[in-house]
């Protein structure tokens, strides 16, 4: 038993550490920044609920608008391909937008009267909620592109690496990327546990001061991503100097170190179709037509289907079938509706969950998600994406039953029959512990396939 445990630990954790390369670090730093961004999650929930008075329905509508930038990842990714040599500028732009969003929220928490003198607090919050996802999606598409660049095409002697070695490197890097995101989440969960310890018993002014401290600490997020871009530049210069010392000329260096994406031409179908998508979404959303969301969904689905058809023409037959099947499976998986902010507010109002308990739940979820990423590493590598998503769908359905049961009073019945031991918090802890390890499993094989198999000009 001990030998088997030691072998599993070596195969799933130590091996991943042995496969780590310095060139992986820049995109991983951008991913860490994405993970650390969750630092303000609990603060935002309670601040909006306690001080801004916005309804869960309003937040759900705002979430629709905040989700539009993420729906534009395809054209933004194409823009990164077009401006490959200048993609670092997009990380700087994203960092500036994220910093602006955080500074707005810091102002709302620390100086609400001054902020309200310029425009309403609700308008400031909406502006912050829109700026933040734009910044994060810009950084995310660049980080995805950086993962392609981080996997070397040649070894230290300038010899071309075999496809099998690069495929393993891509899978390792995507796994490390999920580890970086979740590791950032673990870090912020620990900070939240420490910051919110006993906060429910503090006076209002003291709570506000803690909220302001958290938003101030969150300004480290854009700094981390910018540092990753600077490190990537230094690593590229180091690699070029090392190969130059071995006698390679500048033309050979460019072939070995630079992506062929530098030579691609704009795909006006992708860019034009994306403009149509934005026009449909904004015009219908602003006009507040009846069935507006349904119109936006059908319109955007038509545009995306057309763009997918254009993309499929660039692939070989096997890759075309794989991408199409993957897209359908992921679409259905992602289309499953979630409870939104209403679920968290119900836990706060009805179940009595406070800041410190939600922080502990977040910590448990982050740690076990990280554990699940290691524990299911072989499962992700050996199973198809369709199998993985089907497994996650069935498991997620089963694990949603305890929350549904608590809505109908399950926690009251269990508490009455266990002397108060199995109450709402106990059920929430167990459910979170079971559900969390599955959190990132679907993403790793999909991203690894894209990095390894997509055409060089359409990564």
Regions found by a protein language model. Give the residues of each.
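Substrate-agnostic recognition of the 12-TM MFS/MFS-like secondary transporter fold
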Residues: 31, 64-70, 127-195, 336-339, ...
């Amino acid at each position: 038993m001990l030998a088997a445990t030691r072998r599993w630990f070596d195969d799933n954790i130590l091996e991943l550490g042995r496969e780590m390369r310095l060139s992986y670090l820049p995109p991983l730093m951008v991913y860490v920044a994405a993970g650390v961004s969750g630092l303000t999650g609990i603060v935002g929930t309670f601040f909006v609920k306690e001080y801004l008075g916005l309804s869960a329905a309003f937040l759900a509508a705002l979430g629709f608008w905040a989700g539009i930038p993420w729906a534009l990842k395809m054209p933004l990714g194409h823009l990164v391909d077009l401006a490959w040599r200048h993609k670092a500028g997009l990380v700087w732009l994203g960092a500036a937008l994220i910093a602006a969003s955080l500074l707005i929220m810091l102002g709302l928490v620390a100086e609400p009267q001054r902020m309200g003198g310029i425009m309403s607090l609700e308008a400031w919050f909406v502006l912050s909620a829109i700026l933040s996802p734009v910044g994060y999606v810009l950084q995310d598409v660049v980080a995805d592109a950086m993962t392609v660049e981080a996997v070397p095409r040649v070894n230290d002697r300038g010899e071309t690496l075999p496809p099998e070695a690069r495929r393993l490197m891509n899978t390792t890097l995507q796994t490390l990327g999920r580890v970086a995101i979740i590791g950032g989440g673990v870090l912020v969960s620990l900070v939240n546990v420490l910051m919110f310890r006993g906060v429910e018993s503090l006076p209002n002014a003291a709570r506000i001061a803690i909220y302001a401290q958290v938003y101030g600490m969150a300004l480290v997020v854009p700094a981390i991503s910018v540092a990753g871009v600077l490190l990537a530049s230094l690593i590229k210069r180091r690699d070029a100097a090392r190969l130059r010392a071995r006698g390679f000329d500048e033309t050979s260096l460019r072939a070995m170190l630079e992506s062929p994406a530098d030579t691609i031409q704009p795909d006006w179908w992708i860019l034009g179709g994306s403009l149509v998508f934005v026009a449909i979404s904004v015009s219908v959303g602003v006009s507040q037509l009846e069935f507006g969301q349904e119109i936006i969904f059908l319109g955007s689905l038509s545009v995306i289907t057309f763009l997918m058809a254009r993309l499929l023409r660039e692939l070989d037959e096997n890759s075309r079938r794989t991408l199409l099947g993957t897209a359908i499976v992921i679409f259905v998986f992602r289309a499953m509706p979630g409870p939104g902010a209403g679920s968290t507010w119900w836990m706060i109002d009805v179940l009595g969950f406070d800041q410190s308990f939600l922080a502990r739940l977040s910590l448990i979820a982050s740690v076990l998600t990280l554990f699940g990423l290691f524990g299911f590493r072989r499962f992700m590598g050996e199973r198809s994406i369709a199998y993985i998503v089907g497994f996650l769908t069935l498991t997620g359905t089963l694990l949603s039953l305890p929350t549904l049961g608590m809505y109908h009073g399950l926690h009251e019945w269990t508490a009455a029959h266990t002397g108060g031991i199995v109450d709402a918090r106990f059920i929430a802890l167990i459910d979170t512990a079971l559900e969390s390890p599955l959190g990132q499993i679907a993403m790793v094989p999909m991203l690894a396939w894209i990095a390894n198999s997509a055409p060089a000009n359409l990564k």
